[in-house]
């Protein structure tokens, strides 16, 4: 079993950019959001159950889950949110475990946006890496890339663990408030560290 680093951070913190950089350096990356997309794309294994639970109105013309419609639905209805999580989370967990077991290399970056809020995921990682950015910067990044209003983005931010909670749980922190070069420099230093930790754990 590989040495597993749980990578997390708030929305707009730069998790994807950091994970891509680790992957570029040769790390194996297992991303729960990417797995969720695969499960809910056209022909994905979760689609029949989603259609049965929520009706065909949340399935787009392509046959994939309409993420915007589903997001609106679960924000408005806590019971719908629980039902969707009860369906998807076990599938995501099982697929994550399979991919981690097969992953090559000295260590795995396991990207879990809600790692701090999920005791099950936390118990399965050897180390917690938090990608950190000030809340104002998170909101601005998400607003620019998604077109959502500031109020909508802040609603998502407020539903996640606080910055203080994430930092308290962190073994390592990447400060992502500057340039991509600054991010790469921090990733490269941690990559060297994780290679050593991974080899020592084998």
Short names for language-model regions:
Residues 1-27, 32-34:
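Walker A (P-loop) phosphate-binding motif
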Residues 14, 33, 84, 109, ...:
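Residue-level signal for inorganic ion chemistry
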Residues 28, 127, 171-172:
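Well-ordered beta-strand positions
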Residues 34-37, 133-136, 155-158, 180:
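Short, acidic/turn-prone active-site loops that include or flank metal/cofactor-
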Residues 34-107:
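ATP-dependent small-molecule kinase phosphotransfer cores
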Residues 47-51, 135-143, 150, 154:
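An amphipathic alpha-helix signature
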Residues 93-102, 107-144:
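ATP-dependent NMP and nucleoside kinases share a basic, alpha-helical "lid"
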Residues 95, 104, 122-123, 144, ...:
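Small-molecule kinase domains that catalyze NTP-dependent phosphoryl transfer to phosphate-bearing small molecules
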């Amino acid at each position: 079993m590989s040495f597993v680093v749980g990578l997390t951070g708030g929305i707009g913190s730069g998790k994807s950019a950091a994970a891509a950089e680790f992957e570029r350096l040769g790390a194996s990356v297992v991303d729960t959001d990417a797995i969720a997309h695969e499960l809910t794309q056209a022909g994905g294994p979760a689609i029949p159950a989603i259609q049965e639970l929520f009706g065909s109105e949340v399935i787009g013309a392509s046959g994939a889950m309409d993420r915007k419609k589903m997001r609106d639905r679960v924000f408005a209805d806590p019971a719908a949110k629980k039902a969707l999580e009860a369906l998807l989370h076990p599938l995501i967990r099982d697929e994550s475990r399979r991919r981690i077991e097969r992953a090559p290399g000295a260590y795995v970056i396991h990207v879990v946006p809600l790692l701090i809020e999920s005791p099950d995921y936390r118990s399965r990682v050897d180390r917690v890496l938090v990608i950190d950015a000030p809340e104002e910067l998170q909101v601005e990044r998400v607003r620019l890339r998604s077109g959502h209003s500031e109020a909508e983005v802040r609603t998502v931010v407020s539903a996640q663990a606080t910055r203080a909670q994430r930092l308290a749980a962190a073994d390592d922190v990447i400060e992502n408030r500057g340039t991509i070069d600054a991010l790469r420099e921090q990733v490269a230093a941690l990559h060297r560290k994780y290679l050593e930790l991974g080899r020592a754990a084998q």
